[in-house]
Every structure is written in C-alpha cells, then in structure tokens.
Amino acid sequence: IKSSAASDVYKRQFLFLGGFLLQGFYEELVFRGFFMISIIRKNTIFVAVMVNSILFGLTHGFNNGFQVLALLNLILFGIFESIYLLKTGNIWGISAIHSMWNFIQGNIYGFNVSGMAQSQSIFIFKISNCEIFSGGTFGLEGSLLTTIVLLSAINMVILYNTALQLQ
C-alpha cells in the first residue's frame, strides 16, 4: 500500500465526492425513483424490482472489463437498493449508499469503478491476478467477494426491517 497524501489529492477528492453524490442520486432517481415506481403501478413489486435491477446492470454493459459476474453483482446491487427504498421510502439513503460505494472504491482505495479507472486515490493497491476476487479491469463490482457482500446486504435489509415490525 502506498499513500499519495499530497494536499492537492485531498482537494480533488472533495470535488470528486460532489460528483459522485450527484451521479449516485441521478442513477437512483432514474432507476428506483422513476422506472421502479412506474413499473409497480402496473405490475407486482417483484417484477418492478427485477426489471429495474436488470436494466441498471445492463446500462454498465459497455464498460471496460464487463463480464457475467459484474452483471450479476450490478443486478444484486439494484435489488438491494430497490428493497431498501421500498422498506424505508427514502431515496436519499439509497443515493448516499450508491454514491459512497462508488467514491470509496475508486477515490479512497484506487479500484476501478464499473470498469472506469480513477485518476488519483488516497491509497494505491496492487491488484492480484485472480480476477474472481479482484474483479479484474471492471473493479471490485466484478468480484465474487462483492457477490457475497451484496447477498448479505440484501438479507440484512430484509431481516432488519422485519425485526422492526416484530417489536
């Protein structure tokens, strides 16, 4: 691990954070706030969650290093975000999660985010050649580790809300 701790890096990170906050909010507004809610009006919640999550995954299909595991993980991320929105009714929460997911991967740890390299990060990691764990050129979103994290997150958001309802 190398630290690129020059003060200009931190200034740029602050600007990137603003960009990622806008990007995350925009994607959540479009996919969950518009597509999913529009689909729910004429279909089941299950259909709405799956359709908007698959569309979300497919929009990243032309990104560098895109592969089947990346598509699966992006769909799982869409499912997590959809359930979170349905359980909480809070688009700000899912926007913040989405934005920070991208920002931390790319601008803090230096991983590619959905196949896009970041110009600078606070830390620089040497990625292993084992693409199943590193996600290869797509980044961590194409990793089996991310699949495990997302499946756990989906279960937690379902169980957490259920636990609140039981109280």
Please tell me what each predicted stretch does.
Residues 13-14, 22, 46-51, 71-72, 95, 130-151, ...:
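Hydrophobic alpha-helical transmembrane segments
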Residues 1-6, 10:
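Single conserved hydrophobic/aromatic residue that forms the stacking wall/gate
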Residues 26-51, 83-90:
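Membrane-interface helix/loop boundary segments of multi-pass membrane proteins
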Residues 20, 44-61, 74-75:
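Small-polar-interrupted transmembrane alpha-helices in polytopic inner-membrane proteins
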Residues 13-18, 26, 30, 71-76, ...:
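Membrane-embedded alpha-helical segments of multi-pass membrane proteins
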